[in-house]
Swiss-Prot record:
Record gene name: Pax6
Subcellular location: Nucleus
Organism encoding this protein: Rattus norvegicus (Rat)
Identification of the protein by name: Paired box protein Pax-6
UniProt feature, compositional bias: Low complexity: 170-184, 281-294
Assembly and binders: Interacts with MAF and MAFB. Interacts with TRIM11; this interaction leads to ubiquitination and proteasomal degradation, as well as inhibition of transactivation, possibly in part by preventing PAX6 binding to consensus DNA sequences. Interacts with TLE6/GRG6.
Protein family: Belongs to the paired homeobox family.
Amino acid composition bias (Polar residues), ranges on this chain: 185-194
Region (Required for suppression of NFATC1-mediated transcription): 345-422
SUPFAM superfamilies: Homeodomain-like
DNA-binding region: 4-130, 210-269
């Protein structure tokens, strides 16, 4: 690649980045177009992009020139000081005028021609520059103009005109009043000498400043808005207009209020969900329906051998329901009344039965006892064989017994205690 070029286009042609095509290439494009070549053929022959060929030919057919338009800073300035002053004058006369209306007035009044008329974007840029210059005015000038609009006089920091001046030693207070009157005449003359348009501009700026302040709602307005919010979180335009007419608020303010209120409601709903989840988490151990021994502490077994109380063996069942006890009772041993109760496998349906032994008939082989079960389990439990005992025996104490029973250590004395429980 040569040093004079900075790139190669998609057709293989060289070009200098940011600079227009040379005049020789432009002339060849026009000559080939006159000879009847299509733009796509010209693009392929001269290795120039199709867009570039179309742009040059379009400008040639429109203006008859093959010269490129001005680039960089070589473009003649159309926003001359005279044009800028006219634009500022039109804007002062009508602050709500549009840029295209200013452009039409410049043409109709002969300020500009079709050759040097600024574009709409140029006029908008001039208006932005004028607004920024006004905003960059000193604070003193801004406050002076605002006081002029409010009917006050004097410079910033001094007393308003309606306050009486303090008397200076050696000078009567009437001089101060005359001086204030003179200042009022000065300000009136300034405002009458071309400040009418500035007053309108300052009113517009003051209105914009006031629009940026937060809206203060009365209690009646808040109640009406909250009532409407309870009905729907997204009121339509008809509901907003009806509410605006009712509470004397702009419809846009009502729309913004509902947007802020919905955001507040979402925050509150999030907090409510968090509290609800925290309250739903179990803070205690769930009680099993089968009263397993892992929940309640079992009563410790007696240290005295069981053979000293009964001649039979301990109940050999491993069912969890039979070892079921309550920790609220005082420690008492559990005893069996059967000599040779046969070993039975645990039945799943017996897990809900209580381990209390109730006497059924004292005439059958001394005493015989059955386990107490719910009524719906009677048919199943009647088929279970129960062993009998030929000696004086004791029964298992149910968890519901709250009377402490003292069991003596000798077998002959036990008969005088157990009849009390029957």
């Amino acid at each position: 690649m040569q040093n004079s070029h900075s790139g190669v286009n998609q057709l293989g042609g060289v070009f200098v980045n940011g600079r227009p095509l040379p005049d020789s290439t432009r002339q060849k494009i026009v000559e080939l177009a006159h000879s009847g070549a299509r733009p796509c053929d010209i693009s392929r022959i001269l290795q120039v992009s199709n867009g570039c060929v179309s742009k040059i030919l379009g400008r040639y057919y429109e203006t008859g020139s093959i010269r490129p338009r001005a680039i960089g800073g070589s473009k003649p300035r159309v926003a001359t000081p005279e044009v800028v002053s006219k634009i500022a004058q039109y804007k002062r006369e009508c602050p709500s005028i549009f840029a295209w209306e200013i452009r039409d007035r410049l043409l109709s009044e002969g300020v500009c021609t079709n050759d040097n008329i600024p574009s709409v974007s140029s006029i908008n840029r001039v208006l932005r520059n004028l607004a920024s210059e006004k905003q960059q005015m000193g604070a003193d000038g801004m406050y002076d103009k605002l006081r002029m609009l409010n009917g006050q006089t004097g410079s910033w920091g001094t007393r308003p005109g309606w306050y009486p001046g303090t008397s200076v030693p050696g000078q009567p207070t009437q001089d101060g009043c005359q001086q204030q009157e003179g200042q009022g005449e000065n300000t009136n003359s300034i405002s009458s000498n071309g400040e009418d348009s500035d007053e309108a501009q300052m009113r517009l700026q003051l209105k914009r400043k006031l629009q940026r302040n937060r809206t203060s709602f009365t209690q009646e307005q808040i109640e009406a808005l909250e009532k409407e919010f309870e009905r729907t979180h997204y009121p339509d335009v008809f509901a907003r207009e009806r509410l605006a007419a009712k509470i004397d608020l702009p419809e846009a303010r009502i729309q913004v209020w509902f947007s802020n209120r919905r955001a507040k409601w979402r925050r509150e709903e999030k907090l409510r969900n968090q509290r609800r989840q925290a309250s739903n988490t179990p803070s205690h151990i769930p009680i099993s329906s089968s009263f397993s021994t892992s929940v309640y502490q079992p009563i410790p077994q007696p240290t005295t051998p069981v053979s000293s109380f009964t001649s039979g063996s301990m109940l050999g069942r491993t069912d969890t329901a039979l070892t079921n006890t309550y920790s609220a009772l005082p420690p008492m041993p559990s005893f069996t009344m059967a000599n040779n109760l046969p070993m039975q496998p645990p039945v799943p349906s017996q897990t809900s039965s209580y381990s209390c032994m109730l006497p059924t008939s004292p005439s059958v082989n001394g005493r015989s006892y059955d386990t107490y079960t719910p009524p719906h389990m009677q048919t199943h439990m009647n088929s279970q064989p129960m062993g009998t005992s030929g000696t004086t025996s004791t029964g298992l104490i149910s968890p519901g017994v709250s009377v402490p029973v003292q069991v003596p250590g000798s077998e002959p004395d036990m008969s005088q205690y157990w009849p009390r429980l029957q």
